Amino acid sequence: MPLYEHVFLARQDASTQQVEELTTQITSVIEGLGGKVVKMESWGVRSLTYRMHKNRKAHFVLLNIDGPSAVVAEVERQERINEDVIRYLTVRVDELEEGPSAMMRKADRDRDRDDRGGFRGDREGGFRGDREGGFRGGDREGGGFRGDRGPRRPRDDAAPAPAAATEE
């Protein structure tokens, strides 16, 4: 049978319990039509890139589905009707990914990063130029902003300035 990755976004107003019930409902539809859910991941509430239906955040859920195309058509029909579902996307894949998805691996990596601690002390080199506290360099001698350039040299092709027209 074909393999599918299906992701849907539920409104942020919906509780975690409501999202779990929605996922259970979708799973029962899949199994009722002869398919099966190989993997289910809830990515939690995440920020959206842009507003969708007046929502800035949404519950993200991934389902790996093994079933006929009729299963996908019915799941998408059910999600179109349901007001809690903001968006959904189903992609046919050649093989399903083993282990945690990229989003779950990213969450683990972020959690590991937090364990290192936040502040790592003053950085070598001090001030970075675009931050408060002065400027320590640049690509010009003596460093600094444009004010350090010095006077301009006269142009080679400089012609005498035209005389102002006088009225007689």
Curated annotation (Swiss-Prot):
One of its GO terms (cellular component) is cytosolic small ribosomal subunit. Gene3D superfamilies: 3.30.70.60. Residues 105-158 have a biased composition (Basic and acidic residues). Residues 97-168 are annotated as: Disordered. One of its GO terms (molecular function) is small ribosomal subunit rRNA binding. InterPro entries: Ribosomal_bS6, Ribosomal_bS6_sf, Ribosomal_S6_plastid/chlpt, Transl_elong_EF1B/ribsomal_bS6. This is Small ribosomal subunit protein bS6. Disulfide bonds: none annotated. Keywords: Ribonucleoprotein, Ribosomal protein, RNA-binding, rRNA-binding. The keyword Membrane does not apply. HAMAP family: Ribosomal_bS6. The gene is rpsF. One of its GO terms (biological process) is translation. It comes from Rhodopseudomonas palustris (strain BisB18). Belongs to the bacterial ribosomal protein bS6 family. NCBIfam families: S6. Binds together with bS18 to 16S ribosomal RNA. It comes from the Bacteria.
